């Protein structure tokens, strides 16, 4: 995330990401010790273990920075309790351009919410589609602009709290 934006997270997702961050930070001395051990093995130009440990450290530090930025800019809330309104944490069903046969069901949330089963697509509330649907009521139509510049009409068929 290069630009600062608020990310909606449930308390559960926030806690899970915070635990991951804490574990990565606690692991820093282990990686540093591994690098030191590998450095003592001799010539660094031909030391695969040293380079692998440095690569692992770089990946770990990048993930730490990503999690810190995400958590610092997170808005923590609970999944919506009500049905019928498209909110972050809602599973919505929509149809496009007045074609009731062209439906799609997805979750309005962030990928950090941890949907790992792959059965449910996730659209961010900050995306053009997610943003257009926010606070829409069942039966309401909205429009949004896709990256190609076309304007698409979307109608909310249903909105239910995610039961993940």
Swiss-Prot record:
Q: List, alphabetically, the InterPro entries matched.
A: GreA/GreB_C_sf, TF_GreA/GreB_CS, Tscrpt_elong_fac_GreA, Tscrpt_elong_fac_GreA/B, Tscrpt_elong_fac_GreA/B_C, Tscrpt_elong_fac_GreA/B_fam, Tscrpt_elong_fac_GreA/B_N, Tscrpt_elong_fac_GreA/B_N_sf
UniProt keyword list: Coiled coil, DNA-binding, Transcription, Transcription regulation
SUPFAM superfamilies xref list: FKBP-like, GreA transcript cleavage protein, N-terminal domain
User: What sections of the protein cross the membrane?
Assistant: none
Taxonomy, superkingdom: Bacteria
GO biological process entries: DNA-templated transcription elongation; regulation of DNA-templated transcription elongation
GO terms for MF: DNA binding; RNA polymerase binding
Chain coiled-coil ranges: 50-76
Q: What does this protein do?
A: Necessary for efficient RNA polymerase transcription elongation past template-encoded arresting sites. The arresting sites in DNA have the property of trapping a certain fraction of elongating RNA polymerases that pass through, resulting in locked ternary complexes. Cleavage of the nascent transcript by cleavage factors such as GreA or GreB allows the resumption of elongation from the new 3'terminus. GreA releases sequences of 2 to 3 nucleotides.
Which family, according to UniProt? Answer: Belongs to the GreA/GreB family.
What protein am I looking at? Transcription elongation factor GreA
- What is the originating organism of this protein? Mycolicibacterium smegmatis (strain ATCC 700084 / mc(2)155) (Mycobacterium smegmatis)
């Amino acid at each position: 995330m290069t630009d600062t934006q608020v990310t909606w997270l449930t308390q559960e997702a926030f806690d899970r990401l915070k635990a991951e961050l804490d574990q990565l930070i606690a692991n820093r001395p282990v990686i540093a010790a591994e690098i030191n051990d590998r450095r003592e093995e001799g010539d660094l130009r031909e030391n695969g273990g040293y380079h692998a440990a440095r690569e692992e450290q770089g990946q770990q530090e990048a993930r730490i920075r990503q999690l810190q930025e995400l958590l610092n800019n997170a808005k923590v809330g609970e999944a919506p309790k009500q049905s019928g309104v498209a909110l972050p944490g809602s599973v919505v069903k929509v149809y496009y351009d007045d074609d009731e046969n062209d439906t799609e069901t997805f979750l309005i949330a962030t990928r950090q919410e941890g949907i790992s089963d792959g059965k449910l697509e996730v659209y961010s509330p900050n995306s053009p589609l997610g943003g257009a649907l926010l606070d829409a009521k069942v039966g309401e139509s909205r429009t949004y602009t896709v990256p190609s510049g076309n304007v698409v009409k979307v109608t909310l068929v249903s909105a239910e709290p995610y039961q993940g």
